Amino acid sequence: MTLESMMACCLSDEVKESKRINAEIEKQLRRDKRDARRELKLLLLGTGESGKSTFIKQMRIIHGAGYSEEDKRGFTKLVYQNIFTAMQAMIRAMETLKILYKYEQNKANALLIREVDVEKVTTFEHQYVSAIKTLWEDPGIQECYDRRREYQLSDSAKYYLTDVDRIATLGYLPTQQDVLRVRVPTTGIIEYPFDLENIIFRMVDVGGQRSERRKWIHCFENVTSIMFLVALSEYDQVLVESDNENRMEESKALFRTIITYPWFQNSSVILFLNKKDLLEDKILYSHLVDYFPEFDGPQRDAQAAREFILKMFVDLNPDSDKIIYSHFTCATDTENIRFVFAAVKDTILQLNLKEYNLV
């Protein structure tokens, strides 16, 4: 074989390979285009601690693989850390609010717990378990807990602190509810894709604290639906970042901004009025009218309170043609979220029938 014929042969092989690669790329591009058409992007928005991360966890439980024993074990130290964080917040608040411990020994217990570096906590040693239990039973700490709207305390504090014995047992494995209740502030952007009826739902959770919000801008392209979470129980609370600003007013301001963004002109808006269980407890002793004087409904009435809050948010919508879909939720209740998201999924699919060739 001559050198020329060998080169021609090699060249034709290269051309064939190049054509094959090009064909593969074209095929992949067509596939990507088709998949993009069958992908719904759901953007979870809301202020800090409104329940967005819990909602994502529920999607993993309801529509994903859930949490294996190994996954749950990964939450163990976070549960311990949440317990220390909650007790430290109350110990600091005892001083600020000038509440006294009823039992003298709790001054020493408070000192012991206060000295713990929460981020280094990986175990739950007996001396700390004993100190936390004794502190939680102190009438002074209970009074401090009752005044929690005056400082920052996680919604899960009572859930964990009343169950310290179970959590302190040897070989403790967090339950699904323990996992749902764990509070870890979201920094950055978390995406959770799941497949439903041959459609990919890509749920995007972004940090709700003010410092996190400037990162949102990158998520604003091709959003099918905005899912905006409001914590119903925050009507009497102040912001983590500013202790003279009402959390619900901040949530309203953010919602107004979001629904008037030009990016979201074609996105449907679904409003989740979350933490309805906490509202039902709180409304019995903390009156909505004290924080929102325009409320003229009955006191201690959760139904009247939540309908008023819903109307406040819906009234922020300047576009009379745009429907705000709304649901009252409890993000830690799997069955409630299963039911609500089934309705949300149907709404989203109905609104996107033509575009996604679902008719």
UniProtKB/Swiss-Prot annotation:
Catalytic activity, reaction form: GTP + H2O = GDP + phosphate + H(+)
Any Pfam family hit: G-alpha
Keywords from the UniProt entry: ADP-ribosylation, Cell membrane, Cytoplasm, Disease variant, GTP-binding, Host-virus interaction, Hydrolase, Lipoprotein, Magnesium, Membrane, Metal-binding, Nucleotide-binding, Palmitate, Transducer
GO molecular function terms attached to this record: enzyme regulator activity; G protein activity; G protein-coupled receptor binding; G-protein beta/gamma-subunit complex binding; GTP binding; GTPase activity; metal ion binding
Keyword Lipoprotein (UniProt): yes
E.C. no: 3.6.5.-
Similarity comment: family membership: Belongs to the G-alpha family. G(q) subfamily.
Entry protein name: Guanine nucleotide-binding protein subunit alpha-11
Native species: Homo sapiens (Human)
Gene name of the record: GNA11
